[in-house]
């Protein structure tokens, strides 16, 4: 359903979107949908645009990756070299597909604010407390790492995307170092 329900577009000199590309991306993106009682298979994502390489970022011309703030919210742009690299190493804290689709979960309510749609009021209150700047500052500056760096940048959406990557890439570490945050993502 995910593969057939999206428009797949090759960009930046990529010759074609292959079945391998679709399955690799869909398999990782759909991890984010497991155990969710709500949401519609990334219904707002209409197009997945695949570029051959992240090195096209900042380039000029028709093959260049557009800047992140120029992406329409109905599109997910991915660099195939990064998708393959981050999919291979399950313990490097990075996953291109999970990060970009975490942003889509964040956008389900129309705002990229680090707060995905949560229907249960108790969960909403707990999420607000755990995601509050004070809690995050204490938790992540104490233990350092990528999340602390994202937090100091002051962008809750980036913190959510990076934390989601960490949840799938290194769940034991996240659970050990930040148990409340882990439970919110679970």
Regions found by a protein language model. Give the residues of each.
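Contiguous, non-catalytic segments that form substrate-binding/exosite surfaces or channel walls
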Residues: 1-59
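Amphipathic alpha-helical interface segments used for dimerization/assembly
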Residues: 3, 105, 185-186
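Generic beta-strand structural signal
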Residues: 46-48, 74-76, 94-95
